[in-house]
């Protein structure tokens, strides 16, 4: 996996502005209405969840062009890059699809750079191509998988870098490239560039492994809320559906040959319905 340098990325976008990355029908909001979320504006309440499609800048840009405005960025953890023992590509689809992905296939610093590049590119594109409000989209970071890892220096630097990217080398590189290429834009000047917010994300989605104890999830959420000051989502694992329900659904759909036991269902969070 090879990230595209920001200058090359922007040159590509400016050349292919009518069909960037092969997207021939570029979305533009027809209304000036928006939602308010985390004290930010959101033009459209939809977008990609964390996955392989939100780990490279060009994937995020393509999703924006197709209409996405809320982006759950690919999850990061302390185990990253070549140290991550997962077969690539992460998703194998033949008849049924086996999703063996974990966290980002990049290193954590590389992931941070990709998200900053994507943010800056969208700020330029939305203004230059009149694709909607430059502040009409939201980036939501995603971290995992235990408190020790999330509190590590590596993940802390990632979180702080997205809370405010102004001190990162890639942010300054994006600014300098844009300043030196103002002639390539019709509707962007230096005043606009200096007004681009370096506060990329004020929210986080917590991703935990199957079997993570409820009290560990609570400790992580408390840390993210109180110590990091982030609006926090907790991602619910599909084992909450229960073994019997999951087994029945798969059998009914013709996947009765898929084999799995009750282990993760029994040791993961349990869903209890309270009738009032």
Model features per residue range: what roles?
Residues 236-240, 257-259:
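Non-catalytic helical/linker scaffolds that mediate oligomerization, partner binding
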Residues 274-276:
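Conserved small/polar residues in nucleotide/adenosyl-binding loops
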Residues 187-201, 205, 246-266:
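A solvent-exposed, charged loop/short amphipathic helix patch at secondary-structure junctions
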Residues 1-227:
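N-terminal capping/small domains of soluble enzymes
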Residues 207-213, 235-237, 264-271:
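Catalytic beta/alpha-barrel core
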Residues 212-218, 240-245, 272:
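Active-site-adjacent beta->alpha loops and helix N-cap segments on the catalytic face
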Residues 83-85, 244-248:
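Short acidic, glycine/serine/threonine-rich loops at helix termini
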Residues 72, 233-235:
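Conserved beta-strand positions in the central sheet of alpha/beta enzyme cores
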């Amino acid at each position: 996996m090879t990230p595209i340098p920001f200058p090359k990325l922007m040159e590509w976008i400016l050349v292919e502005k009518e069909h960037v990355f092969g997207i021939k029908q570029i979305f533009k909001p027809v209304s000036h209405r928006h939602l308010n979320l985390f004290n930010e504006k959101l033009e459209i309440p939809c977008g990609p969840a964390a996955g392989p499609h939100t780990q490279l800048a060009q994937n995020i840009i393509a999703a924006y062009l197709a209409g996405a405005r809320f982006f759950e960025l690919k999850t990061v953890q302390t185990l990253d890059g070549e140290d991550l023992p997962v077969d690539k590509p992460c998703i194998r689809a033949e008849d049924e699809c086996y999703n063996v992905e974990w966290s980002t296939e990049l290193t954590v610093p590389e992931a941070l750079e990709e998200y900053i590049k994507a943010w800056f590119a969208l700020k330029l594109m939305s203004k230059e191509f009149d694709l909607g409000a430059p502040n009409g989209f939201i980036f939501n970071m995603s971290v995992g998988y235990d408190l020790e890892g999330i509190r590590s220096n590596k993940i802390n630097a990632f979180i702080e870098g997205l809370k405010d990217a102004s001190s990162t080398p890639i942010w300054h590189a994006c600014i300098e490239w844009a300043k030196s290429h103002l002639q390539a834009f019709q509707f962007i000047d230096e005043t606009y560039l200096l007004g681009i917010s370096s506060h990329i994300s004020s929210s986080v989605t917590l991703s935990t492994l199957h079997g993570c104890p409820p009290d560990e999830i609570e400790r992580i959420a408390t840390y993210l809320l109180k110590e990091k000051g982030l609006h926090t989502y907790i991602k619910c694992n599909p084992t909450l559906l229960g073994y019997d329900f999951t087994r029945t659904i798969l059998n009914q759909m013709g996947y009765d040959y898929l084999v799995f036991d009750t282990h993760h269902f029994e040791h993961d969070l349990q869903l209890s319905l309270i009738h009032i």
